[in-house]
Amino acid sequence: MVKKYGIEILGYESCNMKRRKFIKDTSFLIGGLSLPFVGSSFLSGCSNQPAFKISLAEWSLHRALRSKSIDHLDFISLTKTEFGLDAVEYVNSFFFDKAKDQKYLNEMKTRANDYGVKSLLIMCDNEGNLGDPDSNKRNQSVENHYKWAEAAKFLDCHSIRVNARSDDSLPYQEQLDLAAEGLTKLVEFCNGMNINTIVENHGGLSSNGAWLSSLMKKINHPRAGTLPDFGNFLIKNEDWYDRYKGVKELMPFAKAVSAKSHEFDANGNEVRTDYYKMMKIVLDAGYNGYVGIEYEGNRHSEYDGIHLTSKLLKKINNQNS
């Protein structure tokens, strides 16, 4: 296992280590002679590794879930049978009253195991503001997230995704300090269960890449990280932060990545985000984990939007493998 850019990497780096060890050992044995045919066979497992993996965020099906045309428990099977993916990112809104329902959580876990689908994280909303200026409300928000961390642990997730919201009317630094105080308490709780607490750019100052990266530096904990979203860079009103700059600033702390999509052209390219440019930023940061499809557009059906996003990501993956 190798650490690069603060991220543990197993694939390409470990193959390099294997290659170096092989060359060293064989050089010792045969006086430095090169045996490429032996090396090629020995290292065959190191080639054609995917640059990243693809998962599905439950929000991609939010309209179907809200209309009850599909049930939250069906999300896992759909991910595998309809979209051919093997990892999911849950949204707490779709099982909001089930965080402590052991029977329900066990059913989720059983279905994931039956379909060979990994549960990666739970996106947590509607649990108060972790940077609330009122200390009682801030502490309550921290405690509100405990049950989701416990559920994530049971489901074998690696993280909960939270929001670093404060009072938008407060100064930049004050919001940073308040968010850091609330998040630090939550991070310390989650750390006891080996669960990461990751923050998404999700409105307000969290959509300012410099602010959110500063928040990570202030918290300075290995269990605190980011979930860079390709599209969520609207701070307020019409104040947009540059998405490419923002993702680049957040990638050093990334423990997950959200490939937001809305609309595709006739060539299969996303209209709002240059996926090739964005994924280069992601890969250049040394990230090789899951990239989560999060389609939320209206131009295509949810199913079509997911398939289009998946097709584009797979195309980019093939070009970088």
Model-identified regions with their sequence ranges:
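Short acidic/polar active-site loop segments enriched in Thr and Asp
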Residues: 86, 118, 158, 288-289
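Conserved beta-strand positions in the central sheet of alpha/beta enzyme cores
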Residues: 87-89, 121, 161, 258, ...
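Active-site acidic/histidine proton-transfer and metal-coordination neighborhood
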Residues: 26-39, 77, 111-228, 235, ...
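Glycine-rich, proline-tolerant flexible connector loops at the mouths of alpha/beta enzymes
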Residues: 89-108, 167-170
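Charged helix-capping and loop-helix junction motifs
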Residues: 70-74, 103-107, 138, 142-145, ...
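Secretory targeting signals
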Residues: 1-17
